[in-house]
Amino acid sequence: MTIVELIVSREIDAVIIFESANVIAFADHDPINFGHLLIAPTFPYENFIDVPELVFIEINEVVRDLYRRLDSKFNPDGISFIQNNGKFNDLGHYHLHIFPRFDGDKFGWQSSNLGIQNINDLRKSLEGL
């Protein structure tokens, strides 16, 4: 069973913020900032592409609601979302991170420095997509 399934079945404890038959939202155990939440389907879909459309719609409705609630509670400078698939999905269960951002929080994007210097290089890299 995945961590999310264990939380849904109450086999492990979590700070649950929202739950329906299809979606659960709970506090991340290793948060980037206060208010860092995970939103996931209650069933074990592994990747983004596996989630049925109606469940995905509900997930996005929950994300929108939680965005408003996080914004109201924490008054952040911004709110970020992250979602990983394949070997970068460390839970083996589709989930989306949502967390408040604050100036100076030191969370950032590290450039891979691919060397794309102009629009033509960028266009060529995406040909056939």
Where are these regions (language model features)?
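HIT superfamily nucleotide-processing domains
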Residues: 1-129
